[in-house]
Amino acid sequence: MLELQVIFTTKIKASVFMATAKAKKTTTKENTKTSNKKATSKTATSKKSSGSKNLIIVESPAKARTIKNFLGKDYEVIASKGHIRDLPQHRFGITIKDKHFIPTYDISKDHALLVKEMQDLHKNAEVTYIATDEDREGEAIGYHIVEALNGDISQFPRIVFHEITKSAITHSLDNPRLIDMDRVNAQQARRLLDRIVGFKLSGLLSQKIGRGLSAGRVQSSALKILVDREKEIRAFNPQDYFLIEAYFVADSKAKEEEKLVFDLVRFKDKKIEKLVLQDKKEAEEILAILQKEKFRVESIQQKERVTKSPPPFMTSTLQQTSSNLLGFSPTKTMSIAQKLYEGVKTKDGLAGVITYMRTDSLNIAKEALDNAREFILTSIGKDYLPSKAKIYTATQKGAQEAHEAIRPTNLSFTPQIAAGYLSNDELKLYTLIFNRFIASQMKDAIFESLSVSVMGELSEFKITGRRLVFDGFYKILGNADKDKLLPQFKEGQAIDFKDIQSIQKTTEPPPHYSEAGLIKTLESLGIGRPSTYAPTIRILIDRKYVELEKKQLIVQDIAFNVIAMLEANFEEIVDSGFSAALESKLDDIAENKLEWEEVLWEFYEPFIEKITKGKTSIESQKVMKPTGELCPECGNELVIRNGRYGEFVSCSNYPQCKFIKKEKQEVETSDEICEKCGRPMVVKMSKRGKFLACSGYPECKNAQPLEKPKELSVACPKCGGRLLERKSKRGIFYGCGNYPKCKFITNAEPTNEKCDKCGGMLCWHKTKENTKVCVECKNVVT
């Protein structure tokens, strides 16, 4: 198939989508193992019968419901539920020949019936619109939908919108375009690149270090950042040092609480900074001299300082701020933002209340700017409205400026009104987005800074205070910093001290990265894109490379082994500069500046040579150490092996003999009591990690997860006990905390709401968003 260069001869209408196409260059379709048709200029309506509906294909069911609510009976809206086809799950899925990359795409089993339904609807539709998300991922999903429908992109109008509102949907229908094949190629290059790295390198890691490990272009760069910080922390050598503080008062009658703490900044022409005074004796000698000095106010410096209003959110800053202020993980933030974008209940029915949430742009539509300024004028006050709208520009290369920043879609839907429609977490995130957008268009805050210098014969002390003169954007965001007010001083004024003392301090190691901190670093280095930050952190946690403890990402030992091997043999994979440069090339593909296969081959050729060489040259860390003992089952020698959870002893004749020696270990006790037999519970280890087991095993085989189940603020409908969130091999379920006395259980998330028909408990529907179902009578409530 040939890539299309579309020449629009007339304005595209919703009912007739016509385009003239010509061959431009070999592209994705030519290299895809699918059944493709040639481009055609036949209109999209020529085969339809009169009275047919228009079909709109989106990604998510929630988005489909919201759009259907706006458009009515003339439109059928169906959701693809994400990618309808992808590279095969358990095979490499890419044929590489003569510098060409030919991917094989499979339609997943759970999408097969959906594709059939889409094909049937398309056959009877007047026009079929592709309305997947506006990023590259959405562009590629739209392309694959067209392929699955055995169509040609010239026959499928592509509509995009930054927000799911009636006006935005209507505008997009009046202004369709074609699927952008450059963006599709960029996404496919990324997908194939990630498959090449992940499939080939993960296999090598499993061969050389241990099963269940993975590597990836963005994932491994992020892990290298975390490992480097962990090395800094472990190598850190704390140092003691001394600071000298003087407690001065403006006049001798000042109260105790009015003492002002001044810092020693100079002594005998020596600048006193952190780590300058490391000797306790020297600090005490200086202290003795200072206590005999007379002091006066040498200078007073007063300055006006401006704190600029923050820009509206893009994906990375939303994730960082949500993590810091709300305690939400990046995954949770994006999940809630997705719901707010796709549609929630409002007084006017279903509507998207924020713009698209995967964006690296700071652009704001003119209409939205005008609305924000009107809101500030009428709801906050004219003193807070700047003379003109503030325009922000993203600094990173590749930022898609055609998109918008994240903002509310309707400023009349204030957080106060939204409280009646949104859940607690949805309201928290919506309020954060709403207030940040309004703040971005408000005046800057103004502070008055006051610096006072006090001199002795040999010394100089300083203190700095500040006072908020005009709150500006803090009016809506709030200001957590309290004013540090200083009393009135006069230059030359004699001043007394109440006390002078040396304070011993100790340097601290750099902190572990938080999720927000890692995202900020990845963004600053140009690693990854808005859609990759949350999944990258999630996979590092899932692979047990890091653990999240008290909001900090703690690197595990296995990560050091993985990074050491990658640094020694695949340095470019963990090199942040290389990863950022590759990201930049993907941007160039999307802008038609580079050929996608050339970029892939440039990476693939040297990479696959290293993989081939590494299979024989890289020393395995699965070294088997002899124990001198014999296997009790087959008589071969027992050896020490490295596993994911440390060393263990097994038969050297594995896999023919699968004997594993159970080492006698000190029993790790717990405070838990077995509810079945009353014996104490102990901590044991399985291949999935630690768990609680009854000390009476094998007589009592009771076992529980080590982590306490999450307690819900929902009462059991059977006995009134508290419901708990538990996990099984089949997934999450909810059971009564009074088990086994009460055996109430449900697979759907419970709520405190009651069924208006029978009074039973309402639970969230497992597949239908914004829908609840009664556990007793199965009544469905939307």
Question: Where are the language model's segments positioned?
Answer:
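Intrinsically disordered, low-complexity regulatory segments
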Residues: 1, 8-13, 17-191, 200, ...
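Basic, low-complexity terminal or inter-domain segments flanking catalytic cores
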Residues: 19-55, 65-68, 73-75, 148, ...
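Conserved short loop/turn motifs at secondary-structure junctions
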Residues: 52, 133-134, 210-214, 302-311, ...
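Phosphate-backbone binding and catalysis cores of DNA-processing enzymes
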Residues: 69, 117-151, 157-304, 405-462
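C-terminal accessory/connector segments of nucleic-acid motor ATPases
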Residues: 236-253, 257-262, 296-336, 347-348, ...
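Short acidic, hydrophobic short linear motifs in intrinsically disordered regions
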Residues: 309-322, 348-356, 509-521
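Short, hydrophobic-biased segments on the C-terminal half of alpha helices
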Residues: 334-338, 537-538
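A short, conserved structural fragment
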Residues: 341-355, 543-551
